[in-house]
Each structure stands twice: as structure tokens, then as C-alpha cells.
Amino acid sequence: YDDGSYKPHIYGF
């Protein structure tokens, strides 16, 4: 899961 809150990418899985 990566909503972009700790990374510059937003996947929203």
C-alpha cells in the first residue's frame, strides 16, 4: 500500500 504520504508517488492500492 502506498498512498504517497511517505513517497512522492501516489498509487492508492
Swiss-Prot record:
Its main location: secreted. Keywords: Hormone, Neuropeptide, Secreted. It comes from the Eukaryota. One of its GO terms (molecular function) is hormone activity. It is found in: Secreted. One of its GO terms (cellular component) is extracellular region. GO terms for biological process: neuropeptide signaling pathway. Brain. Appears to be mainly expressed in two pairs of bilaterally symmetrical cells in the protocerebrum. Coiled coil: none annotated. Transmembrane segments: none annotated. The keyword NADP does not apply. The keyword Secreted applies. Inhibitor of fluid secretion by Malpighian tubules. Uses cGMP as second messenger. May function as an antidiuretic hormone. This is Antidiuretic factor B.
